Every structure is written in C-alpha cells, then in structure tokens.
C-alpha cells in the first residue's frame, strides 16, 4: 500500500473510521502498524510480533548485511516458536528499515512492496 492510497483511505474513503493496515504471512503472523502521526507522511510502518518473529532489512546483493535506517533492502524474516524455527528467510518483499519507536522498541519496516527484482513474476494477493 502506498502512502498516497493510505492518505486517500484515511481522509476520503473511510473518513471517521479507524484504518488499521496489517502486514504478515503464515511464518510471521501479523505485524502491527505504528499509529499514524503527521511526520510519517502517511507511510505505513510495521513492527513484527516479537519475540515470535524478527524482521531485518538486508542488502539484496549481500543478504548477510543489514542496511542502515532509512535505506531500502530486501525483507529477511526469522521465526521462532516452540514448534518451529525458520532462520533468516528472504521474503518476496522489499522495504525501508525503520528505527524502533516508543510503542515498539525494535526495528520495523516502512513502505513494504514486492521485491523489485521479482516485479514481473510476483503474484500479489491475499492467500
């Protein structure tokens, strides 16, 4: 979801309704969004459900290197539950790395979208 659509949804489509975007999958569960504040310019920022899942944003060409805050990279997920461990799984998404905030004191992701190198082949949707 783009910041432009987020603004449209909040101000025009769903005026007066609380809009709660989510990001997730079967491995991670649902990442919650950071409550909207004006300085975020309608960017949607998600924080994973720690300690179950940890998201990192890594250099697509060097997936062992985490990018700096604000830089774009590929989303890498680590999941750990009593029944399951999936370390460092490269997702089909890219995003900007977002610093921790008061509500979520761990890294998040901003402006999640399909990984651009897969753009022609990625099928989007709700599964």
Q: Where does each model-flagged region fall?
A:
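Active-site glycine/GP-rich loop and adjacent strand/helix microenvironment
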Residues: 1-127
């Amino acid at each position: 979801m783009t910041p432009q659509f987020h603004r449209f949804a909040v101000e025009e489509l769903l005026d007066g309704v609380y809009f709660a975007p989510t990001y997730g999958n079967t491995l991670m569960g649902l990442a919650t969004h950071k409550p909207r504040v004006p300085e975020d310019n309608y960017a949607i920022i998600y924080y994973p459900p720690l300690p179950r899942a940890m998201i990192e944003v890594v250099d697509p060409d060097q997936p062992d290197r985490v990018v700096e805050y604000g830089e774009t990279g590929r989303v890498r997920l680590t999941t750990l539950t009593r029944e399951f461990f999936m370390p460092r799984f490269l997702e089909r998404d890219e995003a900007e790395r977002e610093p921790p905030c008061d509500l979520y004191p761990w890294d998040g992701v901003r402006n999640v979208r399909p990984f651009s190198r897969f753009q022609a082949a990625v099928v989007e949707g709700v599964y």
